[in-house]
């Protein structure tokens, strides 16, 4: 598991969290090739430009983000990206979609996703996602990590 402390996030091997590591092992065990944090999706927070790096890009064009904690700024970012890049299929795998948005919140991560039309799962990527037909990814609108567009 990633550790959080004053100096930031500690990596777990090649991955930044235990859940990312677990999902990568799932894909590897099924012989599925994937790219890990290789693509940056540009998005705009009003008056400033940013990029978002999804965790996994599956061969069928589905981006998968893994989340243990899903804080407010991250939820806002995902809504902005969905608004600015409706052509991208970005889905989330949570450690637990039943986790509440904040202490005392009546809303869980899963309920938030349902409200906003975000596909999600718990623990691992569902087999149905992996078996879905290929979707075109507009790579010309994305930037490869460590490089230009």
UniProtKB/Swiss-Prot annotation:
The keyword Ribonucleoprotein is assigned to this record: no
Signal peptide segment: none
Origin: domain of life: Viruses
One Pfam assignment: Phage_endo_I
InterPro entries found in the cross-reference section: Phage_T7_Gp3_endoDNaseI (IPR008029), Restrct_endonuc-II-like (IPR011335)
Enzyme class: hydrolase
Keywords: Bacterial host gene expression shutoff by virus, Degradation of host chromosome by virus, DNA-binding, Endonuclease, Host gene expression shutoff by virus, Host-virus interaction, Hydrolase, Nuclease
Listed Gene3D superfamilies: 3.40.91.30
EC code(s) of this entry: 3.1.21.2
Catalytic activity: Endonucleolytic cleavage to 5'-phosphooligonucleotide end-products
GO BP: degradation of host chromosome by virus; DNA integration; symbiont-mediated suppression of host gene expression
GO terms of molecular function: crossover junction DNA endonuclease activity; deoxyribonuclease IV (phage-T4-induced) activity; DNA binding; double-stranded DNA endonuclease activity
Subunit structure: Homodimer.
Protein name, UniProt field: Endonuclease I
């Amino acid at each position: 598991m990633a550790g959080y402390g004053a100096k930031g996030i500690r990596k777990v091997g090649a991955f930044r969290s235990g859940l990312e590591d677990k999902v990568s092992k799932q894909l590897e065990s099924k012989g599925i090739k994937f790219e890990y944090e290789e693509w940056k999706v540009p998005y705009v927070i009003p008056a400033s430009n940013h990029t978002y790096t999804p965790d996994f890009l599956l061969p069928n064009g589905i981006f998968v983000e893994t989340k243990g904690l899903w804080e407010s700024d991250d939820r806002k970012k995902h809504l902005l990206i969905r608004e600015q890049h409706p052509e991208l299929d970005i889905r989330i795998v949570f450690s637990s979609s039943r986790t509440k948005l904040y202490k005392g919140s009546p809303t869980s991560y899963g309920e938030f996703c349902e409200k906003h039309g975000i596909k999600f799962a718990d623990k691992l990527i569902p087999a149905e996602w992996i078996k879905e037909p290929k979707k075109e990814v507009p790579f010309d609108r994305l930037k490869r990590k460590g490089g230009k567009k």
